[in-house]
A protein has these predicted regions:
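A short acidic, Gly/Pro-enriched loop at the edge of an enzyme's catalytic core
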Residues: 160-171
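A short SAM/SAH-binding and catalytic strip from SAM-dependent methyltransferases
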Residues: 171-184
């Protein structure tokens, strides 16, 4: 677990308590319920599931300045469903990508690979769907889930150095991963995604953004204490995209009052405005 990972359980606990409070449960009751019921169950389940995961043989674990969720891999999909980020959210995210058969798709920070597998079904055998993540257990789960039923490919890699030639992909996706990167890596990492996209290629980002109302500001305020998430809540993602030379950058929608979808285009003639 890297130095930022300990923020994750506390943030998840705070969000879970906030949801319980919206249901009329008092603060201390909500926190106690989460601590006594949710956390031990998740820890025990995670230990059980982790013991059965295949290990990535002969693969070098990439170094990254971002936060990885290696420890969360066994129950990541369950937590996503709990927070309303399950299959319907992934399908909505892919609709913003407008994928076509035969296209080459890159999922940066793919986690357990749900988006990558869905994309593989769209681009078909004439296309390519690749997911990368720096967390070995995430990649192990992704490969296990894709075995025998998907053309998706998964690689252990970090956004600092994407293991692909320049201009390799038509579409890239960064779903709920930029808030795991410090500000300087957001900028550098988006530049690396820009490099591997073809001219005219599109990047779809969905991530934390400025809360839409005072209630969500109240629930999200702990995230302002973390440099990785603070820039998201200040509404800076479009600026990072433009700094990486994407042009134009469009906002395509909102979800849950806290998430925004963006589409960013690599110009047909890089270096010139589109």
């Amino acid at each position: 677990m890297n130095k930022w990972s300990w923020w994750c359980p506390w943030t998840a606990l705070g969000l879970a308590a906030g949801i319980l409070m919206l249901w009329g449960v008092s603060l201390w009751t909500a926190l106690l319920a989460a601590l006594l019921l949710v956390c031990p169950a998740l820890i025990l389940w995670g230990l059980f599931k982790t013991s059965s995961l295949p290990q990535a043989a002969q693969e070098t674990i990439p170094e990254t300045r971002g936060m990885t969720l290696n420890w969360l891999a066994p129950f990541y999909d369950t937590l996503c469903r709990f927070y309303g980020l399950g299959r319907s959210f992934r399908e909505e995210t892919l609709r913003h990508a407008t994928l076509k058969p035969g296209e080459h798709f890159l999922d940066v920070g793919c986690g357990t690979g749900v988006l990558t597998r869905l994309a593989a079904g769209i681009v078909g055998s004439s296309g390519l769907a690749v997911g990368i993540d720096p967390a070995p257990r995430m990649i192990a789960v992704a490969r296990k889930n894709a075995a025998g039923s998907s053309q998706a490919e998964f690689r252990l890699a970090a956004i600092e150095r994407l293991p692909f030639e320049s201009g390799s992909f038509d579409v890239a996706m960064a779903s709920l991963m930029l808030h795991h990167l410090p500000p300087n890596l957001k900028r550098d990492g988006l530049g690396e995604v820009y490099r591997v996209l073809k001219p005219g290629g599109r990047l779809i980002v969905v991530d934390l953004d400025r809360p839409a109302n005072p209630l969500w500001w109240l629930l999200a305020w702990p995230l302002l204490m973390m440099p990785m998430t603070a820039s998201n809540l200040r509404g800076e993602i479009p600026y990072y995209l433009r700094d990486a030379k994407f042009d134009p950058v469009h906002t395509q929608g909102r979800r849950m009052q806290l998430l925004t979808f963006w589409q960013a285009i690599k110009p047909m003639n890089p270096g010139e405005p589109s």
